[in-house]
């Protein structure tokens, strides 16, 4: 189905009964073609979806609530349009289950069906202790730079020094807009790499050039990955973007050149 038929940016009615057909799939290939990515993916990874509006009823009609974390593989055929996922989750509000674990399995199966991949994850009780994380690596945001490009993203700004390093850097200045609604997506990006050293000032300008860019979170992550990879011959590269919550959901893409990558800790940063 074309993206124009999705519910993004449109007035919606919340259904009062469970409906898996609310999930709207978007083929990844649509946006990857723009980036020159074919089926031979240049990365491995996952999209981490944290969902804060999950509720259903137990057998006595009493509400249950939880926080969900779901992992959609980067090699899935489709992604899920975020507003459709929000409407889908809210269709469980009057749905009776034996346990929250039953709800968890239903959601995992539905997500696996629509993405054509094995989706994993779980629903946590809301009294689970949460520890805020701090972005790892060197923060590059305090550089005194002049910026005048806020879109489209300019990969010519990615420059490097003729010195080999293995390091981790991060920035809290990433901002783009939803492809359909134009609503802002605010993110913290963590980059780990091994190879020629990125020039921090020019790279920060590159990140800031996404400011008025209209793309989905997953596409922004993959564009940054591809742009770095094409600019510098690296032995290793991973990027992890933690986006702030919108509509009760935050999406955190992770991409890596390492097939045996370790999942990010998924600790919330302060803006989540």
From Swiss-Prot:
It catalyses: 7-aminomethyl-7-carbaguanine + 2 NADP(+) = 7-cyano-7-deazaguanine + 2 NADPH + 3 H(+). One of its GO terms (molecular function) is preQ1 synthase activity. The active site is at residues 178, 185. GO terms for biological process: queuosine biosynthetic process; tRNA modification. Pathway: tRNA modification; tRNA-queuosine biosynthesis. It comes from the Bacteria. NADPH binds at residues 82-83, 246-247. Keywords: Cytoplasm, NADP, Oxidoreductase, Queuosine biosynthesis. GO terms for cellular component: cytoplasm. InterPro entries: GTP-CH-I_C/QueF, NADPH_dep_7-cyano-7-deazaG_red, QueF, QueF_N, QueF_type2. The keyword Repeat does not apply. It is an enzyme of class 1 (oxidoreductase). Catalyzes the NADPH-dependent reduction of 7-cyano-7-deazaguanine (preQ0) to 7-aminomethyl-7-deazaguanine (preQ1). NCBIfam families: QueF. Belongs to the GTP cyclohydrolase I family. QueF type 2 subfamily. This is NADPH-dependent 7-cyano-7-deazaguanine reductase. The lineage of its organism: Bacteria, Pseudomonadati, Pseudomonadota, Alphaproteobacteria, Rickettsiales. The gene is queF.
